[in-house]
C-alpha cells in the first residue's frame, strides 16, 4: 500500500481549511445568537456589546477564510454573502475595501479574496482597495499613505521565484500563485504614485 496522499499538498490543505472553517462557523454563530438573546433580557452593557461584536467579527472572518483558503469549484456564491465576508473581515480596520458585489464562482471569489490579502500586505499604514471583476478579469487597485513590497513574496507571486522562507503571514502569496497557475494565469503588479494595481486577466 502506498503512503502517497491521494491529493497534492495544496489541494489537501484547502480541504483541511474548508473543514476547520465549516466546523467552527456554527458554534461561533450560536454564541452570537446567544449573546443577542441575552442582550434582549438584561440591560445593555459595554461588555456584552464587545462580546457580541467579537462573535460577529469571528464569524465573518471564518467565512472569508473559508473562501480564501478553502477548496473551490464551479459553485456560485451569492453577492450578499461575499460582500458580508469582505465587510466583516475589514470592518473598522485600517483597510477599506470597495467592491460592487456580484455573484461569483467560488474559484473566482477565492482568487479575489487572496488578491485583497496580498494588497493588504503591501499597505502597512492602511488604505483603500478597489476591486473590479468583469469580462474574465479581476482588477485590484490600491492606494495608501505608504506601500511596501517585500521582495520574496512578490517575486514569487509575479515571477514565480522560489520562496522557501514563506511564513504563515505570507501564505496567501503562495496560494494565489498556485491557484492562478491552475487557470494558466499569472498575476501582474504595476506600481504608481501612491498606489498599485494587481491584475488577473483571462479567466474562463
Please describe what each predicted stretch is.
Residues 136-173, 201:
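Glycine-rich/acidic phosphate-handling loop/turn and adjacent ATP-lid/helix
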Residues 183, 201-202:
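Polar low-complexity intrinsically disordered regions
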Residues 184-191:
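Glycine-rich ATP-binding loops of the HATPase_c
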Amino acid at each position: 500500500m502506498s503512503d502517497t496522499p491521494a491529493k497534492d499538498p495544496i489541494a489537501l490543505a484547502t480541504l483541511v481549511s474548508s473543514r476547520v472553517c465549516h466546523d467552527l462557523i456554527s458554534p461561533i454563530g450560536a454564541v452570537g445568537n446567544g449573546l443577542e438573546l441575552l442582550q434582549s433580557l438584561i440591560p445593555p452593557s459595554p461588555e456584552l456589546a464587545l462580546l457580541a461584536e467579537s462573535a460577529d467579527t469571528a464569524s465573518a472572518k471564518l467565512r472569508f477564510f473559508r473562501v480564501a483558503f478553502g477548496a473551490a469549484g464551479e459553485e456560485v456564491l451569492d453577492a450578499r454573502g461575499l460582500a458580508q465576508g469582505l465587510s466583516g473581515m475589514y470592518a473598522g480596520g485600517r483597510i477599506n475595501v470597495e467592491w460592487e458585489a456580484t455573484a461569483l464562482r467560488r474559484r473566482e471569489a477565492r482568487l479575489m479574496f487572496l488578491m485583497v490579502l496580498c494588497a493588504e500586505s503591501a499597505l502597512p499604514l492602511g488604505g483603500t482597495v478597489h476591486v473590479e471583476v468583469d469580462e474574465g478579469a479581476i482588477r485590484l487597485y490600491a492606494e495608501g499613505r505608504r506601500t511596501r513590497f517585500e521582495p520574496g513574496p512578490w517575486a514569487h507571486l509575479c515571477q514565480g521565484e522560489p520562496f522557501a522562507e514563506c511564513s504563515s503571514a505570507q501564505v496567501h502569496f503562495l496560494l494565489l500563485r498556485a491557484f492562478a497557475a491552475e487557470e494558466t494565469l499569472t498575476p501582474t503588479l504595476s506600481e504608481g504614485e501612491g498606489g498599485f494595481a494587481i491584475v488577473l486577466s483571462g479567466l474562463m
